[in-house]
C-alpha cells in the first residue's frame, strides 16, 4: 500500500504540514511583507511627485496601515 493512504501516518503528515505552513507564514510576515511594504511606500512617494509623499512616520507603522483604503 502507498504510504500516503495509510491511516497510521495521517496524523504525522497533518502535523508536519501544519508546522511547515506555520514556518512559511512566519517567514513571510517577518521578512517578505515588511520589504514589500517599504517598497510600496517608496514607490508611492516617488509617484506622488513629493507633494503627497507620506511622512517618515508612515514607514514605521504596523502592517495594518498598508491595507487602509483611505491612504491609497
Curated annotation (Swiss-Prot):
A single cellular component GO annotation: mitochondrial membrane
Chain segments annotated as transmembrane: 16-36
Keyword Transport: yes
Intracellular or extracellular location(s): Mitochondrion membrane
Taxonomy, superkingdom: Eukaryota
The protein's assembly and partners: F-type ATPases have 2 components, CF(1) - the catalytic core - and CF(0) - the membrane proton channel.
Name of the protein this chain belongs to: ATP synthase protein 8
Taxonomy of the source species: Eukaryota, Metazoa, Cnidaria, Anthozoa, Hexacorallia
Gene, per the UniProt record: MTATP8
Amino acid at each position: 500500500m502507498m504510504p500516503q493512504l495509510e491511516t497510521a501516518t495521517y496524523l504525522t503528515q497533518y502535523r508536519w504540514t501544519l508546522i511547515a505552513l506555520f514556518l512559511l507564514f512566519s517567514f513571510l510576515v517577518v521578512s517578505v511583507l515588511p520589504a514589500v511594504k517599504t517598497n510600496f511606500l517608496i514607490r508611492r512617494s516617488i509617484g506622488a511627485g513629493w507633494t503627497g509623499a507620506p511622512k517618515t512616520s508612515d514607514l514605521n507603522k504596523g502592517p495594518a496601515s498598508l491595507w487602509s483604503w483611505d491612504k491609497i
